[in-house]
């Protein structure tokens, strides 16, 4: 079987996702699709709009054959760890031939070239990176500038204003990290990319006759009503959303505030909360009335909005240094969220070709720190979304789509 892997959040599943899935099948000419999907918390450091089982149903309705969960520790991390967790999981299955992801540039050769430089770290590139970091630039910005300078020195023929745009676009950054992970793992999986169409990844406005971003759809659902988003998602996705409840960001803020006020040292356990940002958060926690307000009071050139969101999410989930160290290795299990008939065949192939632990029912799963953290994350998510009960991971079986 020719199997394609895709890495998603489907938060929620919209028309852009539908196009990506269809195009991925066409460009790779595959027999089946495995989707690695974030669980109940996502890469922005927020609870998913709706739970992982509802989003799994959306994926299966759309034509994904097998949905597996990206462990929460990777799902709530920076692009580098998010990508490594997802790619290493796909690689460990030993059945995936291709990976297909969206990017703003749609240029797989450029993405591969950039990721190759980053993974090989030529001495001159390392020197430039060090210099830009000394200037106080955040790591992603410093790396982008170092890459541009290195390529310029090596007479790489490219419009540098275009390259700067490439290096500062969300999906391109993830695409580079996906390829970097493939190089790191010496994987035989072949990468493909599809140019992202429609609204920008971070665009929060819904515009008629344009594919909306998930950010805009979420904002519309939270601030007005779900009916406004009908034109921007498939009917099956809309119907599933209409019959579920959404996570409550105000409740998340209350829980984060409680965690920090009751134990200010909680921030010291999170390596990303360094360089005095922990003190800044503590100073502003009493002044803010919402998560958004707290982040805006604390953000700086070095600490972006999303980076702070992830730090606060890790406070909520009580992440510590020992847990974070697990991100350096590939997950040694795969949690099955749902499948169709073809997905069942793919699972048989995984069992034949891979030694990875396949988790269908938690009651039969081997003890694993990453898996235990996922269970805890779902239990915390149950405080934010009334559709989810404590111990839902034990109570809900994989979705079987017929």
From Swiss-Prot:
Gene Ontology MF, one: ATP binding
GO cellular component: cytoplasm
Chain segments annotated as coiled-coil in the UniProt record: none
InterPro entries on file: Rossmann-like_a/b/a_fold, tRNA(Met)_cyd_acetate_ligase
EC main group: ligase
GO process annotations (BP): tRNA modification
Key words of the record: ATP-binding, Cytoplasm, Ligase, Nucleotide-binding, RNA-binding, tRNA processing, tRNA-binding
Cleaved signal peptide residues: none
Catalytic reactions on record: cytidine(34) in elongator tRNA(Met) + acetate + ATP = N(4)-acetylcytidine(34) in elongator tRNA(Met) + AMP + diphosphate
Main localization (coarse): cytoplasm
One Pfam match: HIGH_NTase1
Keyword Nucleotide-binding found: yes
The family this protein is said to belong to: Belongs to the TmcAL family.
NCBIfam families on file: PRK13670.1
PANTHER family (alphabetical): TRNA(MET) CYTIDINE ACETATE LIGASE (PTHR37825:SF1)
Protein function: Catalyzes the formation of N(4)-acetylcytidine (ac(4)C) at the wobble position of elongator tRNA(Met), using acetate and ATP as substrates. First activates an acetate ion to form acetyladenylate (Ac-AMP) and then transfers the acetyl group to tRNA to form ac(4)C34.
Protein name per UniProt: tRNA(Met) cytidine acetate ligase
Species for this entry: Clostridium perfringens (strain ATCC 13124 / DSM 756 / JCM 1290 / NCIMB 6125 / NCTC 8237 / Type A)
Designated gene of the protein: tmcAL
């Amino acid at each position: 079987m020719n199997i394609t892997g895709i890495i998603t959040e489907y938060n929620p599943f919209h028309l852009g996702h539908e196009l990506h899935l269809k195009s991925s099948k066409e460009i790779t000419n595959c027999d089946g699709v495995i989707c690695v999907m974030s669980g109940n918390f996502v890469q922005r450091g927020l609870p998913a709009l709706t739970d992982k089982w509802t989003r799994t149903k959306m994926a299966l309705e759309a034509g994904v054959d097998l949905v597996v969960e990206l462990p929460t520790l990777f799902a709530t991390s920076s692009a580098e760890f998010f990508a490594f967790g997802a790619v290493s999981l796909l690689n460990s299955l030993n059945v995936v031939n291709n990976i297909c992801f969206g990017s703003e540039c749609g240029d797989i050769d450029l993405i591969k070239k950039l990721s190759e430089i980053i993974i090989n770290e030529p001495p001159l590139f390392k020197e430039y990176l060090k210099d830009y970091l000394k200037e106080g630039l955040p790591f992603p910005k410093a790396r982008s500038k170092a890459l541009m300078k290195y390529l310029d020195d090596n007479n790489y023929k490219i419009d540098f204003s275009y390259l700067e745009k490439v290096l500062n676009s969300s999906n391109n950054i993830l695409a580079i990290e996906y390829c970097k992970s493939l190089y790191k793992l010496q994987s035989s999986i072949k990468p493909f990319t599809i140019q992202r169409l429609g609204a920008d990844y971070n665009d929060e406005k819904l515009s008629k006759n344009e594919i909306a971003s998930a950010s805009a759809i979420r904002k519309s659902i939270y601030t007005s009503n779900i009916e406004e988003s009908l034109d921007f998602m498939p009917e099956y996705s809309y119907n599933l959303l209409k019959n579920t409840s959404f996570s409550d960001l105000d409740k998340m803020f209350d829980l984060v505030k409680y965690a920090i006020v009751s134990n200010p040292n909680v921030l010291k356990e999170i390596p990303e909360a360094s360089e005095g940002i922990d003190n800044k958060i503590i100073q502003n926690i009493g002044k803010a009335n919402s998560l958004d307000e707290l982040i805006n009071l604390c953000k700086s050139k070095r600490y972006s909005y999303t980076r702070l969101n992830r730090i606060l999410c890790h406070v909520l989930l009580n992440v510590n240094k020992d847990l974070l160290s697990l991100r350096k290795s590939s997950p040694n299990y795969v949690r099955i969220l749902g499948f169709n008939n073809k997905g069942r065949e793919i699972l048989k192939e995984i069992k034949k070709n891979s030694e990875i632990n396949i988790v269908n029912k938690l009651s039969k799963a081997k003890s694993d720190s990453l898996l235990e953290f996922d269970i805890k994350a779902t239990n915390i998510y149950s405080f934010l979304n009334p559709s989810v009960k404590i111990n839902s991971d034990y109570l809900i079986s994989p979705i079987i789509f017929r």
